[in-house]
């Protein structure tokens, strides 16, 4: 039994000490030429209109959706409405959750 163990250790040591050469590197082949002439460059694409859009009339508003329609709107705002402000002011500092007495015992 000892002979088999010694033989296995010897085979393992010889295999670990072997200096194998690096595997040969094979570069991929160059791509085949598709055509022997150069392709012309594509035409430039212009993403603008040749003229400016017409000015919208004051009395009509185009509503675009599933069913486009034209809604007539007045040129001036309706009377009686105050100008709308943003979302309002921030809440005052006295609007906060009241402090309870049950937490005062932990602060001492």
Curated annotation (Swiss-Prot):
GO terms for cellular component: extracellular space. Residues 1-18 form the signal peptide. Expressed in the middle and posterior regions of the follicle cells. Residues 87-108 are annotated as: Disordered. It comes from the Eukaryota. The keyword Signal applies. It is found in: Secreted. One of its GO terms (molecular function) is serine-type endopeptidase inhibitor activity. Keywords: Secreted, Signal. GO terms for biological process: oocyte development. Residues 52-88 form the VM domain. Belongs to the vitelline membrane family. This is Vitelline membrane protein 15a-1. The gene is 15a-1.
